[in-house]
């Protein structure tokens, strides 16, 4: 019988999982249907599909890890399953962060106007550049996740069962923990790329605004609006990542912290919020996805209205 804290944990994780799978699944479904209709796919659609799929995998593996931890506390920590979950988690987490950095770079190259030969060359080769980054992101994530497969969880912690379930941590956990922390620090690179993209977008916006003021036009042009939308999207991602990444690192080192099980439970709830909530920000920030989402809401509203029982 789960305790009150465990019951709250299960309810929150199940709710966030449902919302996250629905939001990211919606992104994949709408873009794939559009792909089949037009028999062509745009670069932004490829990025969003890749990002949404990685987020679905991340949501699922975080949830599975939490449920296994509660349901099989005495065997899960020493099983092969925990190694598989950890590898998939590492791959999905890193690929999600890298694909998001690809989205930020796409916004930068598509919208910003920077008078530098190298930047101009990148804009001309935007399709090849972004596809190369996407492929590189996939390979980097794969290499990092494979490097985790050395039975490190066996050295990370040992679960013992007493009268009440307790988590008994050993000194041998330290090498595995530090290795995982070191590998996961590599996920700071996508964050830095997003920060650079934000800085350059802001620089481009300031310069563009000055040009408008010199031309004495008293209204926002499409370029200014595009700059603002891109900057807002990158800022939101950076804010979410600032919350997500430290919590993820704490979870990675939870074996070194007292009450490690409680830390993992709180960490799961916080980390699953990032891929769940960001999907709806992406939907509302993309005209095609936003239109499809609003159309679906109108359909649901009409459907519920028709099913409403008649009251004389």
UniProtKB/Swiss-Prot annotation:
Q: Which residues are glycosylated?
A: 164
Topology of this chain in the membrane: Multi-pass membrane protein
Q: Name one GO molecular function term.
A: bitter taste receptor activity
**What PROSITE patterns would the database entry show?**
G_PROTEIN_RECEP_F1_2 (PS50262)
What CDD domains is this protein classified in? 7tm_TAS2R7-like
Write out the GO cellular component annotations: plasma membrane
TM ranges are 10-32, 53-72, 87-109, 129-146, 181-203, 235-257, 262-284
Q: Does the keyword tRNA-binding apply?
A: no
Q: Does the keyword Nucleotide-binding apply?
A: no
Q: Which UniProt keywords apply?
A: G-protein coupled receptor, Glycoprotein, Membrane, Receptor, Sensory transduction, Taste, Transducer, Transmembrane, Transmembrane helix
Residue ranges in the Extracellular topological domain are 1-9, 73-86, 147-180, 258-261
Q: Where does this protein reside within or beyond the cell?
A: Membrane
Q: Which family does it belong to?
A: Belongs to the G-protein coupled receptor T2R family.
Further remarks about this protein from its record: Several bitter taste receptors are expressed in a single taste receptor cell.
Main role? Gustducin-coupled receptor implicated in the perception of bitter compounds in the oral cavity and the gastrointestinal tract. Signals through PLCB2 and the calcium-regulated cation channel TRPM5.
Q: What is this protein called?
A: Taste receptor type 2 member 9
Q: Which organism is it from?
A: Pongo pygmaeus
**Gene (name only):** TAS2R9
């Amino acid at each position: 019988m789960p305790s009150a804290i465990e019951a709250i944990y299960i309810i929150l994780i199940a709710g966030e999982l449902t919302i996250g799978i629905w939001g990211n699944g919606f992104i994949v479904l709408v873009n794939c249907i559009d792909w089949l209709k037009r028999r062509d796919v745009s670069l932004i659609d490829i990025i969003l599909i890749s990002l949404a799929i990685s987020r679905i995998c991340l949501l699922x593996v975080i949830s599975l890890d939490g449920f296994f931890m509660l349901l099989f506390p005495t065997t899960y920590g020493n099983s092969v399953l925990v190694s598989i979950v950890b590898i998939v988690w590492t791959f999905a987490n890193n690929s999600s962060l890298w694909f998001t950095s690809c989205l930020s770079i796409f916004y930068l190259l598509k919208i910003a106007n920077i008078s530098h030969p190298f930047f101009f060359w990148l804009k001309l080769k935007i399709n090849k550049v972004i596809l190369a980054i996407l492929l590189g992101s996939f390979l980097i994530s794969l290499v990092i996740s494979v490097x985790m497969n050395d039975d490190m969880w066996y050295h990370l912690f040992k679960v013992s069962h007493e009268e009440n379930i307790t988590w008994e941590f050993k000194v041998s956990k330290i090498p595995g923990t530090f290795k995982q922390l070191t590998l996961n620090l590599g996920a700071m690179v996508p964050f830095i790329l997003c920060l650079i993209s934000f800085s350059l977008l802001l620089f481009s916006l300031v310069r563009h605004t000055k040009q408008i003021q010199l031309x004495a036009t008293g209204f926002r042009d499409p370029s200014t609006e595009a700059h603002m939308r891109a900057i807002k999207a990158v800022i939101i991602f950076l804010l979410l990542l600032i919350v997500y990444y430290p919590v993820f690192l704490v979870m990675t080192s939870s074996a070194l912290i007292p009450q490690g099980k409680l830390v993992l439970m709180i960490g799961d709830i916080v980390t699953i919020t990032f891929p769940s909530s960001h999907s709806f920000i992406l939907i509302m920030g993309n005209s095609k996805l936003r239109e499809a989402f609003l159309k679906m809401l109108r359909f649901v509203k009409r459907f519920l209205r028709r099913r409403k029982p008649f009251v004389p």
